[in-house]
């Protein structure tokens, strides 16, 4: 009986050792990480997919894991011949995105709610929805084909550049933190800047403005508004609304550009208006095509 008991105990120990060995072997070969496969289904654009596979560490296994998603806060995919950023929605921790200089026609960033910086300039965008990106402080969407831009939900915006689009209007009344605004080369007929008290730099050249009121922009230090349609009393009002500059250096007031022909410059700034601007510390300037620089503008006779 004793021998039988000893044999049974030995068998139990052997089996136990086998179970332990099996468990140890399993722990040495964990299951593959769960995540998003970097494939054509999830990232249909071959250039975007190639960039992810070749330029980021997760390209080694072709899987975008949850840990990698949480650590990816910046993506720089500029000038990569990308036509679609489908798949960008998986990067939910993304804070900074540069996708400029590509061939992108549409951009869905509704899932990228942590974005603070977006450069999507020099693409072929006709629409841009940033209503879910309330944390954006910098939005650069220059050189596109946008006919409208709603930034009413982007109250944290400090820098907005929508240069060279097809905009006919732009509402920035909710963007009270704006410091720099560039809306050159659009078709905007009026702009309300009364709530933008922190604005320091304004580019609104080559639009269709007939009036411009800067009386609520006491921190303004730079104004570019050439090739609009501001003249006469409206030019008087514009100059009268410029904030007083009490520093030793003139602030730039780029008001005239005849480089595209005199007929394309709708602004008129007379000699007396030039003197009125200079009395407030602003130097009216015109573009010199020969010197390729901005020079002091003497003013027109009438």
Predicted regions: what is each one?
Residues 109-113, 130-135, 151-156, 172-177, ...:
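Right-handed parallel beta-helix/beta-solenoid
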Residues 73-77, 97-99, 116-120, 137-141, ...:
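Conserved hydrophobic beta-strand positions in leucine-rich repeat
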Residues 182-184, 196-210, 217:
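Eukaryotic tandem repeat interaction scaffolds
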Residues 72, 94, 104, 115, ...:
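Conserved hydrophobic position(s) of the canonical leucine-rich repeat
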Residues 85-88, 107-109, 128, 149, ...:
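Canonical leucine-rich repeat
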């Amino acid at each position: 009986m004793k021998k039988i008991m000893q044999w049974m105990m030995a068998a139990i120990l052997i089996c136990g050792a086998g179970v332990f060995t099996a468990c140890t072997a399993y722990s040495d070969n964990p299951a593959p990480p769960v995540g998003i496969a970097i494939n054509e289904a999830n990232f249909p654009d071959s250039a975007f997919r190639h960039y992810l596979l070749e330029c980021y560490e997760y390209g080694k296994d072709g899987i975008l894991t949850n840990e990698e998603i949480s650590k990816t806060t910046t993506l720089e995919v500029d000038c990569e011949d990308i036509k679609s950023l489908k798949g960008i929605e998986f990067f939910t921790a993304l804070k900074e995105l540069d996708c400029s200089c590509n061939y992108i026609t549409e951009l869905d960033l509704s899932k990228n709610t942590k974005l603070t910086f977006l450069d999507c300039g020099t693409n072929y965008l006709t629409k841009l929805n940033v209503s879910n990106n309330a944390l954006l402080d910098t939005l650069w969407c220059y050189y596109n084909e946008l006919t409208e831009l709603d930034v009413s939900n982007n109250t944290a915006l400090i820098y907005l550049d929508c240069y060279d689009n097809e905009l006919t209007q732009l509402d920035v009344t909710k963007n009270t933190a704006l410091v720099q605004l560039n809306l050159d080369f659009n078709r905007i007929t009026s702009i309300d800047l009364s709530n933008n008290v922190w604005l320091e730099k304004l580019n609104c050249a080559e639009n269709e403005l007939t009036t411009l009121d800067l009386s609520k922009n006491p921190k303004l230090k730079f104004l570019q508004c050439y090739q609009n349609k501001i003249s006469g009393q409206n030019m008087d009002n514009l100059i009268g609304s410029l904030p007083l500059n009490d520093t030793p250096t003139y602030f730039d007031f780029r008001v005239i550009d005849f480089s595209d022909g005199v007929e394309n410059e709708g602004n008129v700034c007379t000699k007396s208006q030039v003197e009125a601007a200079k009395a407030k510390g602003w130097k009216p300037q015109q573009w010199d095509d020969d010197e390729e620089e901005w020079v002091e503008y003497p003013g027109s006779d009438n």
